[in-house]
Design a protein with these regions (language model features):
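Flexible, glycine/small-residue-enriched loop-and-beta-strand segment within the central core
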Residues: 54-126, 152-153, 159-161, 166
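Short flexible/disordered coil segments
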Residues: 8-11, 107, 112-119, 140-141, ...
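N-terminal segments that cap or nucleate solenoid repeat domains
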Residues: 38-55, 59
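Terminal amphipathic alpha-helical/low-complexity segments used for targeting or macromolecular assembly
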Residues: 1-44, 72, 85-90, 152-177
């Protein structure tokens, strides 16, 4: 379902969003359930077994149907998901063209990914399964499965399976019961 966000839809969304945020005060499970329903209602494709999405994450509301999130995905604080980009307008103006424009692109995050705080995910990005995207990273393009990405622009600094095995052997983490 393609819902373009006119002013009325934005007002409705903001009112519903206030309710979702307040639900976090009652229960984390209730918050996640309501948030998933809200995002799905506006066209985002989101797995039934959603992980965690921090309330401060920003999803480009130009067209939610351009965003797909898999199972067990963690989205940390202040992550930006941008599905459109108007930079081409400045490029066209600089080259003497009198027309504007914008780029649109889908964003897909496959299963079992961790997106760190203040990551920016740009249009036309596909993040494969089991990836870790480090805090502050700017991501664009295809990210291979099991990659650990860091920086601006994002670069692969390791692989999640090797990283997980190393920390499992060192036992330097706190296990979740």
């Amino acid at each position: 379902m393609d819902i373009r966000f006119n002013k009325f839809n934005k007002i409705i969304y903001k009112l519903l969003w206030v309710g979702v945020r307040l639900s976090k005060l009652v229960s984390q499970d209730l918050y996640l359930k309501l948030y998933q329903r809200l995002l799905s209602k506006f066209g985002m494709k989101i797995a039934d077994r959603m992980g965690y999405i921090d309330p401060s994450a920003f999803f480009d509301n130009y067209d939610y149907s351009f965003i797909t999130i898999g199972s067990n995905v963690t989205i940390s604080r202040e992550v930006l998901f941008l599905t459109h980009d108007f930079s081409i307008s400045q490029g066209l103006a600089a080259s003497g063209k009198e027309c504007g424009g914008y780029f649109m692109g889908k964003i897909t995050i496959e299963d079992n990914c961790f997106i760190g705080a203040r990551v920016t995910v740009l249009p036309n990005t596909h993040i494969g399964k089991n990836c870790i995207i480090g805090a502050g990273t700017v991501v664009k393009g295809k990210i291979e499965e099991n990659s650990i990405m860091l920086g601006n622009p994002a670069r692969c600094i390791g692989h999640t399976d090797e990283w997980g095995n190393r920390h499992f052997q060192m036992k330097d983490y706190i296990p979740i019961q």
